[in-house]
């Protein structure tokens, strides 16, 4: 059985960021937003290097920008999303089927007066659109978090003692 993905945007965590998975998504008529981390260190490094240079002089680089501010449960979160289409700065962009853009989300969280900032990197088959990227990633995490909550409540996942190695869950 296969998933009907035509017209969808598929978001995947870093572990699933592989060219063959991107190709399978495109073969089904869908677009992808793939997370970059240590799974693709050279590609992630090229996005990070580009973003560092961009921050030094943002007016010289075409880009899209979106900002979302959420305040909830004593926490303030600001997500600043930057989307780019300068693929020539990326390491081996031709490996990624129909790659059209990449993005950075700077997530700034303030809890009890302490602020942390995390930068997350993405590649996508969609045109550079910061608002769409920001929304798609946020929806991804809403689904992810609700699934973890269901596992914790329904299956007692948090009470599981076996958490490492080859232990069955």
Where are the model-predicted features located?
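Basic, amphipathic alpha-helical segments enriched in Lys/Arg and hydrophobic/aromatic residues
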Residues: 136-169
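An anionic, glycine-rich sequence signature occurring as long contiguous blocks
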Residues: 31-33, 37-138
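Phosphate- and divalent-cation-binding pockets in alpha/beta enzyme and binding domains
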Residues: 20-21, 42
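Conserved, well-structured functional cores that handle cations and Mg-NTP chemistry
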Residues: 1-12, 17-20
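Anionic group-transfer/hydrolysis microenvironments
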Residues: 15, 37, 154
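Mobile genetic element proteins and their domesticated derivatives, centered on retroelements
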Residues: 10-13, 32, 122, 144
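Short, positively charged, Gly/Tyr-enriched micro-motifs
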Residues: 12-18, 25, 162-165
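Short, surface-exposed basic-aromatic patches at helix termini and helix-loop junctions that form
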Residues: 22-30
């Amino acid at each position: 059985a296969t998933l009907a993905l035509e017209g969808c945007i598929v978001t995947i965590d870093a572990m699933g960021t592989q060219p063959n998975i991107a190709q399978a998504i495109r073969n089904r008529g869908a677009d992808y937003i793939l997370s970059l981390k240590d799974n693709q260190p050279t590609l992630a490094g090229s996005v990070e290097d580009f973003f560092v240079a961009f921050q030094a002089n943002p007016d010289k680089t075409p880009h899209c920008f979106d900002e979302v501010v959420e305040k909830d449960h004593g926490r303030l979160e600001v997500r600043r999303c930057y989307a780019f289409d300068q693929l020539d700065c990326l390491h081996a962009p031709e490996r990624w089927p129909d790659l059209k853009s990449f993005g950075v989300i700077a997530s700034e969280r303030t809890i009890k007066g302490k602020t942390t900032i995390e930068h997350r990197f993405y590649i996508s088959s969609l045109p550079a659109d910061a608002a769409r990227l920001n929304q798609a990633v946020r929806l991804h995490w809403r689904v992810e978090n609700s699934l973890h909550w269901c596992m914790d409540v329904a299956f007692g996942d948090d009470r599981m003692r076996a958490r490492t190695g080859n232990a069955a869950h």
